[in-house]
Design a protein with these regions (language model features):
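PAPS-dependent sulfotransferase catalytic core
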Residues: 1-103, 159, 331
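Short His-Asn-centered micro-motif
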Residues: 30-32, 119-122, 143-144, 219-220
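Glycine-rich phosphate-binding loop used to anchor ATP phosphates in small-molecule kinases
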Residues: 99-127
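Conserved phosphate-donor/acceptor-positioning beta-strand/loop module used by diverse small-molecule
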Residues: 120-121, 134-154
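Long, charge-dense
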Residues: 159-183
Length: 332
């Protein structure tokens, strides 16, 4: 019965979209899992004639399993040497060759006729610029504070592969870093291991990649300074409808059911600014100051300063608007 249901789902996806690319570049949204990426994808997908591919390398999903391109998380790692295959798969998706990978017909922002795509991807950190060039895409890189991101996650499926990666040890880490990382991996708490995973998943992008033509967006600025940030998105990505993006900012993501009860309670608050501030700061009541300090010790181990102790928004160089820090400091 399950197989039959999956087959019907694949059939509906295959028949539910006609895609012909015209003009503007497709958007490749890279982010860490539970960092607001579904919400961000839906904000971008609110635009006319857009469709989306939601985690086309997530091996837990039946359509990804059916595609058969990858079967294990390690195949997304640089050590596997599968880069050309993975990029070719993205190119095939651009050409609508795996039609069963299309969005489900009854999901939010589904459209029968489309001409532009947003891809949401939680891996391929080492291939972002190759994806940009090979797929002629625009890169959006979404950041969220490592503590709430980690607290929202239940598993870190690629952490073991990161720690064992010869590619990372050779290109991005020295012996002292590798030794300390292994100590945390083997003897740290789940929280510390989650921060470790966040650092690995963002290290290349924040320290080593050529990012001059990427668009960095932080979850906190998009939420707290929504209108200005949506206008920045529209300008940089050639998006015509700022109004639909602003509306999407205030609409919970389709995966809201994965959120904890405290988040669901916050979303019921009718005061928009109070609600947004609570979403950005609620994690501070869930950890000790010692844990927060330990988080930033791990970031320092990787040479990362994008977020700092006792500050809820990213470093100024990752923000687009001067008043975001002031907004973040004003409790509603």
């Amino acid at each position: 019965m399950t197989i039959f249901r999956e087959y019907i789902g694949f059939l509906l996806r295959s028949l539910g979209n006609i895609h012909v690319h015209r003009g503007h570049k497709d958007i490749f949204l890279f982010a860490t899992a539970r960092g607001g990426s579904t919400w961000m994808m839906e904000i971008l997908a609110s635009q006319p004639r857009f469709k989306y591919y939601d985690e086309p390398f997530n091996i837990r999903r039946p359509n990804v399993q059916h595609a058969g391109i990858i079967h294990e998380w390690r195949e997304t790692m640089p050590d596997a040497g599968r880069g050309a295959d993975l990029i070719h798969f993205l190119q095939d998706l651009q050409r609508n060759r795996f039609r069963f990978m299309n969005p489900a017909p009854f999901r939010r922002h589904h459209r029968l006729v489309t001409d532009r795509i947003v891809f949401k991807i939680h891996c391929l950190e080492h291939l972002i610029n190759e994806v940009k060039e090979s797929c002629d895409g625009q890169i959006v890189f979404l950041l969220r504070h490592p503590i709430p991101t980690t607290l929202s996650r239940h598993v870190f499926p690629r952490l073991d592969h990161f720690v064992a990666s010869c590619h990372f040890q050779k290109n991005y880490l020295d012996e002292t870093q590798v030794r300390e990382i292994r100590k945390i991996h083997c003897g740290g708490t789940d929280f510390q291991r989650g921060i470790l995973s966040w650092c690995f998943e963002n290290l290349i992008q924040l320290r080593f990649a050529d990012t001059h033509d990427w668009l960095f967006v932080t979850y906190e600025e998009l939420l707290l300074n929504s209108e200005k940030t949506c206008r920045t998105l529209a300008e940089r990505l050639s998006l015509p409808r700022v109004d639909t993006m602003i509306a999407a900012v205030n609409t919970p993501a389709a995966n809201i059911k994965m959120s904890r009860q405290d988040t669901l309670n916050i979303l019921k608050d009718s005061n928009e600014q109070k609600r947004k501030y609570a979403l950005v700061t609620k994690w501070k009541d869930k950890i000790s100051d010692a844990d927060e300090r330990r988080c930033f010790e791990i970031l320092e181990l990787f040479g990362l300063d994008v977020y700092r102790h006792n500050r809820i928004v990213a470093h100024d160089r990752y923000l687009h608007h001067a008043d975001t820090v002031e907004i973040a400091a004003q409790r509603p």
